Regions:
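Hydrophobic beta-strand segment of the Class I
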Residues: 27, 121-122
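Class I SAM-dependent methyltransferase SAM/SAH-binding core
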Residues: 57-110
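C-terminal alpha-helical "lid/dimerization" subdomain adjacent to the S-adenosyl-L-methionine
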Residues: 156-208, 212, 218
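Conserved alpha-helix/loop element of class I SAM-dependent methyltransferases that forms part
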Residues: 26, 35-56
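Core SAM-dependent methyltransferase catalytic element
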Residues: 206, 212-236
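N-terminal auxiliary segments of SAM/dcSAM-dependent transferases
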Residues: 1-17
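A short acidic, Gly/Pro-enriched loop at the edge of an enzyme's catalytic core
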Residues: 109-120
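A short glycine-rich, Lys/Arg-flanked "PGG" loop and its adjoining helix->strand segment in the class I
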Residues: 134-149
Length: 236
Protein backbone atom coordinates (compact mmCIF):
# COMPACT_ATOMS: atom_id res chain seq x y z
CA UNK A 1 0.00 0.00 0.00
CA UNK A 2 1.43 3.35 -1.00
CA UNK A 3 1.63 6.26 1.41
CA UNK A 4 0.75 9.85 0.57
CA UNK A 5 3.90 11.16 2.20
CA UNK A 6 6.52 8.56 1.27
CA UNK A 7 8.32 9.12 -2.02
CA UNK A 8 11.94 8.25 -2.80
CA UNK A 9 14.50 10.61 -4.26
CA UNK A 10 14.51 14.36 -4.64
CA UNK A 11 10.78 14.85 -3.95
CA UNK A 12 11.22 13.37 -0.48
CA UNK A 13 11.98 16.65 1.31
CA UNK A 14 8.89 18.43 0.01
CA UNK A 15 6.62 15.54 0.95
CA UNK A 16 8.08 15.21 4.45
CA UNK A 17 7.77 18.97 4.89
CA UNK A 18 4.07 18.72 4.00
CA UNK A 19 3.70 15.91 6.51
CA UNK A 20 5.15 17.83 9.45
CA UNK A 21 3.27 21.00 8.52
CA UNK A 22 0.05 18.99 8.81
CA UNK A 23 0.77 17.60 12.29
CA UNK A 24 2.89 20.29 13.99
CA UNK A 25 0.22 21.51 16.43
CA UNK A 26 -0.49 18.01 17.79
CA UNK A 27 2.97 16.51 17.33
CA UNK A 28 3.97 16.44 21.01
CA UNK A 29 0.60 15.10 22.17
CA UNK A 30 0.66 12.24 19.68
CA UNK A 31 4.28 11.42 20.52
CA UNK A 32 3.20 10.99 24.14
CA UNK A 33 0.22 8.85 23.18
CA UNK A 34 1.89 6.54 20.68
CA UNK A 35 4.99 5.95 22.83
CA UNK A 36 3.12 5.95 26.16
CA UNK A 37 5.40 8.83 27.16
CA UNK A 38 8.55 6.75 26.68
CA UNK A 39 9.99 9.11 24.05
CA UNK A 40 10.81 11.46 26.92
CA UNK A 41 12.94 8.77 28.58
CA UNK A 42 14.74 8.01 25.31
CA UNK A 43 15.48 11.69 24.77
CA UNK A 44 16.87 11.94 28.31
CA UNK A 45 19.34 9.20 27.34
CA UNK A 46 20.40 11.32 24.37
CA UNK A 47 21.02 14.25 26.72
CA UNK A 48 23.00 12.06 29.14
CA UNK A 49 25.20 10.78 26.31
CA UNK A 50 25.78 14.36 25.15
CA UNK A 51 27.64 14.97 28.44
CA UNK A 52 27.01 18.71 28.31
CA UNK A 53 29.39 21.11 30.02
CA UNK A 54 28.74 24.83 30.25
CA UNK A 55 29.46 26.72 27.05
CA UNK A 56 29.81 23.80 24.66
CA UNK A 57 28.28 24.31 21.21
CA UNK A 58 25.50 21.92 20.25
CA UNK A 59 23.53 21.44 17.04
CA UNK A 60 20.20 19.62 17.12
CA UNK A 61 19.21 18.61 13.59
CA UNK A 62 15.62 17.91 12.58
CA UNK A 63 14.84 19.56 15.91
CA UNK A 64 11.07 19.59 15.42
CA UNK A 65 9.30 21.17 18.37
CA UNK A 66 12.55 21.47 20.27
CA UNK A 67 12.59 18.76 22.96
CA UNK A 68 16.27 17.86 22.62
CA UNK A 69 17.48 21.38 21.84
CA UNK A 70 15.72 22.83 24.89
CA UNK A 71 17.11 20.12 27.18
CA UNK A 72 20.66 20.72 25.93
CA UNK A 73 20.23 24.45 26.54
CA UNK A 74 18.93 23.86 30.07
CA UNK A 75 22.19 22.08 30.86
CA UNK A 76 24.35 24.98 29.71
CA UNK A 77 25.08 24.30 26.04
CA UNK A 78 24.88 27.02 23.41
CA UNK A 79 22.35 25.37 21.13
CA UNK A 80 21.20 25.78 17.55
CA UNK A 81 18.13 23.82 16.52
CA UNK A 82 17.69 23.30 12.77
CA UNK A 83 14.60 22.03 10.98
CA UNK A 84 13.11 22.60 7.54
CA UNK A 85 9.50 22.74 8.81
CA UNK A 86 8.45 26.30 9.63
CA UNK A 87 5.31 25.17 11.55
CA UNK A 88 7.40 22.85 13.76
CA UNK A 89 9.92 25.64 14.39
CA UNK A 90 7.06 27.98 15.32
CA UNK A 91 6.02 25.55 18.07
CA UNK A 92 9.65 25.22 19.22
CA UNK A 93 10.02 29.00 19.37
CA UNK A 94 6.93 29.31 21.57
CA UNK A 95 8.44 26.85 24.06
CA UNK A 96 11.77 28.55 24.68
CA UNK A 97 12.23 30.85 27.68
CA UNK A 98 15.16 33.03 26.56
CA UNK A 99 17.66 33.58 23.78
CA UNK A 100 18.95 29.98 23.90
CA UNK A 101 18.38 27.84 21.83
CA UNK A 102 18.43 29.61 18.49
CA UNK A 103 16.05 27.93 16.04
CA UNK A 104 16.72 28.21 12.30
CA UNK A 105 15.09 26.82 9.18
CA UNK A 106 17.47 24.75 7.09
CA UNK A 107 18.35 21.46 5.42
CA UNK A 108 20.14 18.71 7.36
CA UNK A 109 21.75 17.62 4.08
CA UNK A 110 23.26 21.08 3.58
CA UNK A 111 24.02 22.31 7.09
CA UNK A 112 24.77 26.06 6.97
CA UNK A 113 27.81 25.93 9.27
CA UNK A 114 31.55 25.50 8.70
CA UNK A 115 33.48 22.29 9.32
CA UNK A 116 34.39 21.49 12.94
CA UNK A 117 31.82 23.84 14.50
CA UNK A 118 30.07 21.82 17.22
CA UNK A 119 31.02 19.77 20.29
CA UNK A 120 27.68 17.92 20.17
CA UNK A 121 25.50 17.05 17.16
CA UNK A 122 22.15 15.37 17.84
CA UNK A 123 19.24 14.22 15.70
CA UNK A 124 15.94 12.82 16.97
CA UNK A 125 13.64 11.01 14.54
CA UNK A 126 15.17 12.63 11.49
CA UNK A 127 17.67 10.32 9.81
CA UNK A 128 15.13 8.01 8.12
CA UNK A 129 13.30 11.08 6.76
CA UNK A 130 16.28 12.36 4.80
CA UNK A 131 16.58 11.78 1.05
CA UNK A 132 20.01 10.26 1.83
CA UNK A 133 20.75 9.07 5.36
CA UNK A 134 24.38 8.52 4.35
CA UNK A 135 24.72 12.16 3.30
CA UNK A 136 23.06 13.13 6.56
CA UNK A 137 25.74 11.24 8.50
CA UNK A 138 28.47 12.86 6.41
CA UNK A 139 27.12 16.32 7.19
CA UNK A 140 26.92 15.53 10.91
CA UNK A 141 30.52 14.35 10.81
CA UNK A 142 31.61 17.44 8.89
CA UNK A 143 30.21 20.00 11.35
CA UNK A 144 31.27 18.10 14.49
CA UNK A 145 34.57 19.12 16.05
CA UNK A 146 37.27 16.45 16.40
CA UNK A 147 36.26 14.60 19.56
CA UNK A 148 32.68 15.82 19.14
CA UNK A 149 29.81 13.51 20.00
CA UNK A 150 27.24 12.52 17.36
CA UNK A 151 24.01 11.07 18.79
CA UNK A 152 21.04 9.86 16.75
CA UNK A 153 17.71 8.67 18.18
CA UNK A 154 15.54 6.86 15.67
CA UNK A 155 12.99 4.13 15.13
CA UNK A 156 14.74 0.76 14.89
CA UNK A 157 14.18 -2.73 13.58
CA UNK A 158 14.04 -5.39 16.30
CA UNK A 159 16.36 -8.34 15.72
CA UNK A 160 13.78 -10.85 17.00
CA UNK A 161 11.49 -11.76 14.09
CA UNK A 162 8.35 -12.27 16.20
CA UNK A 163 8.77 -8.99 18.08
CA UNK A 164 9.56 -7.19 14.81
CA UNK A 165 6.34 -8.53 13.26
CA UNK A 166 4.26 -7.46 16.27
CA UNK A 167 5.92 -4.06 16.33
CA UNK A 168 5.37 -3.44 12.62
CA UNK A 169 1.71 -4.44 13.05
CA UNK A 170 1.42 -1.82 15.80
CA UNK A 171 2.94 0.79 13.48
CA UNK A 172 0.60 -0.28 10.67
CA UNK A 173 -2.62 -0.26 12.70
CA UNK A 174 -2.56 1.44 16.10
CA UNK A 175 -0.31 4.39 15.29
CA UNK A 176 -2.25 5.61 12.21
CA UNK A 177 -5.49 5.22 14.20
CA UNK A 178 -4.09 7.49 16.91
CA UNK A 179 -3.08 9.99 14.23
CA UNK A 180 -6.58 9.92 12.75
CA UNK A 181 -8.35 10.37 16.10
CA UNK A 182 -6.19 13.16 17.48
CA UNK A 183 -4.87 14.83 14.33
CA UNK A 184 -7.39 13.91 11.64
CA UNK A 185 -4.52 12.48 9.61
CA UNK A 186 -3.84 8.74 9.53
CA UNK A 187 -1.53 8.91 6.50
CA UNK A 188 1.00 11.08 8.35
CA UNK A 189 1.45 8.34 10.94
CA UNK A 190 1.20 5.42 8.50
CA UNK A 191 4.29 7.07 6.99
CA UNK A 192 6.37 5.93 9.99
CA UNK A 193 6.21 2.27 8.97
CA UNK A 194 6.62 3.06 5.27
CA UNK A 195 9.77 5.10 5.92
CA UNK A 196 11.12 2.50 8.34
CA UNK A 197 10.81 -0.23 5.69
CA UNK A 198 13.22 1.76 3.51
CA UNK A 199 15.61 2.65 6.35
CA UNK A 200 18.42 0.20 7.14
CA UNK A 201 18.16 0.95 10.88
CA UNK A 202 20.56 0.94 13.78
CA UNK A 203 23.07 -1.79 12.89
CA UNK A 204 23.64 -0.49 9.36
CA UNK A 205 24.01 3.05 10.68
CA UNK A 206 26.61 1.87 13.20
CA UNK A 207 28.48 -0.02 10.47
CA UNK A 208 28.47 3.09 8.28
CA UNK A 209 29.80 5.19 11.16
CA UNK A 210 32.71 2.79 11.59
CA UNK A 211 33.34 2.86 7.85
CA UNK A 212 33.47 6.67 8.07
CA UNK A 213 36.16 6.40 10.77
CA UNK A 214 34.03 7.55 13.66
CA UNK A 215 35.35 6.18 16.94
CA UNK A 216 33.37 4.55 19.78
CA UNK A 217 30.47 3.75 17.43
CA UNK A 218 27.80 1.85 19.34
CA UNK A 219 24.09 1.11 19.47
CA UNK A 220 21.84 1.50 22.50
CA UNK A 221 18.57 -0.37 21.98
CA UNK A 222 15.26 0.27 23.71
CA UNK A 223 12.23 -2.02 23.70
CA UNK A 224 14.15 -4.86 22.08
CA UNK A 225 15.43 -2.65 19.28
CA UNK A 226 12.14 -0.95 18.41
CA UNK A 227 13.92 2.31 19.22
CA UNK A 228 17.66 2.89 19.18
CA UNK A 229 20.39 5.43 19.72
CA UNK A 230 23.43 5.46 17.47
CA UNK A 231 26.36 7.07 19.28
CA UNK A 232 29.82 7.87 17.95
CA UNK A 233 32.69 10.32 18.37
CA UNK A 234 34.38 12.16 15.52
CA UNK A 235 37.99 11.04 15.29
CA UNK A 236 40.82 13.51 15.72
Amino acid sequence: VSNTFYVPGEQRAAKVNDLFASIARRYDLINDLQSFGLHRHWKRRVIALAAVTTGVRALDLCCGTGDIALSLAERGAEVTGLDFSAPMLAVAGQRKRGANPIFIQGDALKIPFPDNSFDIVTMGYGLRNLASWEQGLAEMQRVAKPGGRVIILEFGKPANALWRSLYFTHLQCSVPLTGWIFCGNSQAYAYILESLKHYPAQLAVAAKMREMNFSQARVINFMGGAMAINYAVKAG
